[in-house]
């Protein structure tokens, strides 16, 4: 005998670091499935987790139920260790739940070290960079929020206090909250005494492991005048005061065209 009703509940819990949009949708096969919100996306102020509970009536339905929604990584992912997770459980009565299914994802980071010549050979502070997504320094640069000197995270959309400027210190500069992909850094602000016609633009490829969250970075493609190099997993970026201080590859390349 068939059922007149067949209640089916789905609970979704998104971790701290995710902003859940109320755009849940469901299908069985190619047919849209209606549902009601038992609990609309609700953030727990203590844990930062967002819980949503949906109720379906699956009487007379068969097939795989697929539920989709979108979420945006937010600033809290940094304090959450660059990791977000999503947990789903199902129930017939909204009380007894199946063991949870957990999905985890990570964002990553990379570092670069800015240095000059002479007294600045160990670190050059005050140089400004813009960061562009992709293999070219074109379009609108990404915006960041400064966490501390030399530490920046990707800004949320329209976040107050965000800026496209990343400023070097005498130590490493860390750029956090990024997904895997290519990023191009272009020097846009200079330190007095250094040549403005010999400035670095370079592209890195960031790979974030979704197994353990580790980040790896390599130089690829664009590397103007050879001023960037990869040493001990940190991108080393040089500024010079004259052509004789360029790395050999950059000096040779410049000589060919002068």
Where would I find each of the regions flagged by the language model?
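Solvent-exposed loop/turn and edge beta-strand elements of beta-rich ligand-binding domains
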Residues: 1-258
